[in-house]
Amino acid sequence: MKAQPSCEVGKGSGINQNKPVYVISDLHIGDRSPRDNLCRANRESLLDSFLHHVENQKGQLVIIGDFLELLRYPLDNVLARRKTLLDRLADMDTVYVPGNHDEDVIRWADTTNPPHPFFARISHAFVRHIGGRRFKFMHGHEVDPLANAGIQNLGRVIGRLAYLCEFRQGACLLSNDTVIGLLEETGEQLLHVWTWLLAGLHTALRESCGRLPAGRIRFLTRRIRTQRMLTRYYRDKTEGLYDIAIVGHTHRAGTFGDWYFNSGSWTGARSNFLRITPDGDVGVFNWTDNVPQPNRTVVA
């Protein structure tokens, strides 16, 4: 397992505990090119209405990882083409904890001159006392034994290939997100298989698309990984590192017991978020038709 940062590390530990805290993750935002996740369906307008809701509720927004999709899209392009969104999030005093898909930006956590004001409140994973309990805000890859350097580097290669191919309309390609999910579940064995697959990339991917939809692959692999990771979260909890885990990473919004809360993602059919009251009560919601709808999913 990767070493985790000290519990109190991070600018995020200064969030206002007198406000409701709204938590989102896994938006995987790109540079506005055709397959940018936020450009699909009505996700851009959904996010806009959600941000209005947070502002109207005088809430504190916390983004816990994979906000940006930097395994596929060049950072400079994203910063240039998403400036309006970044400006708005900076004005909202948003706290940002990077994940494994946007970990490149964590280097700005210790600088006084980030490339945009949004990154002024970038933070490592942190613990915050709310309602008398210790809440750990983290992406979740920190306890994922398969989110290792080898997978990450290969993911960058796959992401760049996907970026070059994505302008081909109607191409039957598994998404970068799907391929990385498969790699994380099968580890080193699939790395060898992937070397062989590269020789017949287009044929293999076309056949895979016909046999098993990408969405089904993601569902199966993430469910297995969630169950494995819950054991690791619980061990950290029992060792006294925190009382409540506020995490993302698996794209599966929901709860486990009264201590694990996952913020889901904004990449699927539903867009999810968490709301934490000043008293420490946590709710899981879907943002549907511009209003919050309770999500009562138990993840395992």
For the regions a language model picked out, list residue spans one by one.
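Surface-exposed, flexible loop/turn segments at secondary-structure boundaries
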Residues: I29, E69, D102, V143, ...
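Membrane-proximal helix-turn-helix segments that form the acceptor-binding/catalytic region
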Residues: L86-D87, Q189, Y233
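Short, solvent-exposed aromatic-acidic interface loops
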Residues: F285-P294
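Glycine-rich phosphate-binding loops of NTPases
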Residues: N295-A300
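Active-site-proximal loop/helix segment associated with metal-binding centers of metalloenzymes
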Residues: G140-M229
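Core catalytic region of metal-dependent phosphoesterases/phosphodiesterases
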Residues: G14, N18-I24, I29-G131
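Conserved beta-sheet core of the metallophosphoesterase superfamily
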Residues: N113-A125, G131-K136, H141-A162, R223-F285
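Acidic, histidine-bearing metal-coordination/catalytic regions of metal-dependent phosphoesterases
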Residues: M1-K19
